[in-house]
From Swiss-Prot:
Catalyzes a salvage reaction resulting in the formation of AMP, that is energically less costly than de novo synthesis. Pathway: Purine metabolism; AMP biosynthesis via salvage pathway; AMP from adenine: step 1/1. This is Adenine phosphoribosyltransferase. Keywords: Cytoplasm, Glycosyltransferase, Purine salvage, Transferase. The gene is apt. It holds the Pfam family Pribosyltran. One of its GO terms (molecular function) is adenine phosphoribosyltransferase activity. It catalyses: AMP + diphosphate = 5-phospho-alpha-D-ribose 1-diphosphate + adenine. GO terms for biological process: adenine salvage; AMP salvage; purine ribonucleoside salvage. It comes from Gloeobacter violaceus (strain ATCC 29082 / PCC 7421). GO terms for cellular component: cytoplasm. It is found in: Cytoplasm. Homodimer.
Length: 171
């Protein structure tokens, strides 16, 4: 199955000059969604993750069913102010701005092997911030899983050395 057939491109969103890769059309199609989760599981299952971390918010959509498929726990990494207990916070730069992410300080019992999942790898800033949060919370990142990689932004080069990185679709 070619997942590009299920991903809509929206020009000038969220800013002029950005080509937004919209995965809501993929989520709409049960066979494409199942294929996506099955493909991620097939390519990351051997990593032996104890937890899947999903990055807010589209990482939740793929991370939670992947965690179920891999028989792992799920840990959300959220935007600031959304988690109720004590958190670690990391700031990062996006393709089109700046932001921050947070994780509960007690998210993992060390040693925990963690797979970080998001819908998109662009500049790498979000994934790197999530990986730093995982480490601060006592986990070890064993891999990254993405639905889409924007290769022209070279975000993969910014990911930490060691953990594997999987992207199902490249633009």
């Amino acid at each position: 199955m070619d997942l590009k057939d299920y991903i809509r491109t929206v020009p000038d969103f969220p800013e002029p000059g950005i080509l937004f890769r919209d995965i809501t059309t993929l989520l709409h199609e049960p066979k494409a969604l199942r294929y996506t989760i099955d493909s991620l599981a097939e390519q990351t299952g051997s990593l032996g993750a104890d937890y899947v971390v999903g990055i807010e918010s589209r990482g939740f959509m793929f991370g939670t069913p992947l965690a179920i498929k891999l028989d792992c726990g799920f840990v959300p990494v959220r935007k600031p102010g959304k988690l109720p207990a004590a958190v670690f916070k990391e700031e990062y730069t996006l393709e089109y701005g700046k932001n921050a992410l947070e994780i509960h300080q007690d998210a993992f019992a060390a040693p925990s092997r963690v797979l970080v999942v998001d819908d998109l790898l662009a500049t790498g800033g979000t994934a790197v911030a999530a990986a730093q949060l995982v480490e601060r919370a006592g986990g070890t990142v064993v891999g990254f899983g993405f639905i889409i990689e924007l290769t022209f932004l070279n975000g993969r080069a910014k990911l930490p050395e060691g953990p594997s990185a999987v992207a199902l679709v490249s633009y």
